């Protein structure tokens, strides 16, 4: 970055990710692209799997295209996001081809009765935990009869946080043909910031699970 002239490279801090922006100046689009290509290759080589996606296409569109390409389906189980993951998925026209539906399991009772999360698991670990996030995802996959499923459970605030489980803590579960995994995030911002960031992260974790075969 220190030695750059044309093209230029900028790192932009966004909610939940860092955007790498390459800008080239040339007389034609084709000439600009020729300047960009070598740097694009260098950045992709150095960052490897840490590269998320092309930001000119939304995460929900990227995930939708991936699901359509492999003829797969997805369902959701949401607690703290209370439907925002499903909303993002259905922002895409034609999403009914792959999104089968979701369960908003805001209460522990619904987590247990509808998604099949064991009551002793809820009592032992609490709703905001790795174990429950995984069980929620597995339950959603069974209910929706889908290829994949994703869950969210967290503390969006402003109240409800503790030293052990602070406001902003969110657990995600993703399940599919490669088993079940969980991801933990400590998000910042107000209640809506945390919920929106969690919904967007949920889609990202499904995308990486699919493209990296269960990670």
Predicted regions and their residues:
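Accessory alpha-helical/coil subdomains and C-terminal extensions
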Residues: 1-16, 21, 31-36
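Short beta-strand-to-loop capping motifs
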Residues: 22-26
């Amino acid at each position: 970055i220190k030695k750059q002239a044309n093209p230029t490279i900028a790192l932009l801090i966004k909610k939940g990710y860092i955007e790498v922006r390459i800008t080239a100046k040339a007389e034609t689009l084709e000439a600009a692209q020729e300047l960009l290509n070598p740097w694009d290759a260098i950045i992709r080589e150095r960052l490897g799997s840490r590269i998320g996606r092309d930001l000119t296409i939304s995460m929900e569109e990227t995930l939708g295209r991936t699901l359509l390409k492999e003829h797969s389906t997805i369902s959701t189980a949401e607690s703290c996001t209370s439907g925002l993951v499903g909303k993002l998925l259905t922002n895409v026209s034609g999403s009914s081809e792959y999104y089968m539906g979701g369960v908003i399991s805001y209460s522990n009772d619904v987590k247990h009765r509808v998604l099949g999360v064991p009551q002793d698991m809820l009592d032992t670990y609490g709703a905001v935990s790795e174990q429950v996030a995984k069980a929620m995802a597995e339950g959603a996959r069974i209910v929706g009869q889908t290829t994949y499923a994703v869950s969210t459970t967290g503390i969006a605030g402003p109240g409800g946080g503790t030293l052990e489980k602070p406001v902003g803590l969110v657990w995600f579960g993703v399940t599919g043909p490669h088993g079940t995994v969980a991801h933990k995030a400590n998000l910042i911002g107000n209640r809506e910031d945390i919920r929106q960031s969690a919904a967007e992260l949920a889609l990202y974790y499904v995308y990486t699970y699919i493209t990296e075969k269960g990670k």
